[in-house]
Amino acid sequence: MLINISCAKCIGIKAVPVRVEVDIATGIGIHLVGLADAAVKESLLRTITALQSMGFRIPGKKIVINLAPADMHKKGSGYDVPIALGIIAASGQRDLPLLGKYMIMGELGLD
């Protein structure tokens, strides 16, 4: 199931729209694509650990996370919350009907 979440990349005081797309399908592994820097790539481990500590399960399937547009560099930890919500919604663990109505950014702790 494909989930789209709106967030933003901050450039100075300007917010440039970014879309986090999360898809869960047959296969294995977690893949992050879309010109993410090291901090964004590290967010996967932080996000997975935070979800597990809150009692959510990580599907034993292939999870693809795309940060669009693909031609724009993304940096920072503000993508943690959109990625986490995308995994929760795409795996069917919660119904999040208002997800598409808000721009979401935020960092997660491990707990």
State the predicted function of each range.
Residues 1-111:
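Peripheral, non-AAA+ core regions of ATP-driven protein-machinery
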